[in-house]
Amino acid sequence: MNARFIHPAHPHIVAHNCFEVIGDTIRLELTQGEYALFDLVDLPLVAPHRWCAAWFRRNIYAITQMRDERGRQRSVRMHRLIIGVADPEVLVDHRNLDGLDNHRDNLRVATRAENGWNCPRPLRNKSGFKGVTRDPKSSRYSAEIKVNGVTLRLGRYTCPVEAARAYDEAARRHHGAFARTNF
C-alpha cells in the first residue's frame, strides 16, 4: 500500500498510495479497503501525501497528516485540500453525499445551513421520506421543512408520497441547489 508509484504524465511526483488512472479520474487506494476518487489535474496536490480512510459521523473521508504554519501535525481531509479551504469554519459539501468522491464538480463551499440541507433522510425516520412523519393517531402523514430555524408545516396527507412531494417542492423553493429531495 505504501509503495511509491510514479505516474508517466507526472514523473516528478512520487505517490505514497497505490492509484489507478481511469480517464480523467484517479482512484486512490486507502485503508479499510476503501478508495477515493478525484480529478487527474489534482494528482500533483494529492499524490505526495499518505492517505487513509476515516469515519466521521455517518460518512467516510480520505484524510492525511500535514504540518501547519507553526509546525504542528494536523489532519486534513482530501476534499478540503482540493478546494483549498483551510478555515475550519468554512464547510465543503459533497453534492452526491459520497465523502470519498472528491471530483471538483462534486465539491462546493457551503454554509452550515446549506450543508445541512444536503443531508439524507434521518436514520430513525419511519415514513421512508425526508421531511415526512406519520401521526399514529390519525394515520395521516405530515410534511414539514425547516427554513431559517423555523419549522414550516406544509400540510397533512393521506399518502406518504404526497407528503414527500410537498416536502420536495418546498425544499427546491427554499434550499435551491442544496436541496436534498426524495424524488
Region roles according to the model:
Residues M1-V92, L97-F183:
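Conserved recognition-core residues within compact binding domains
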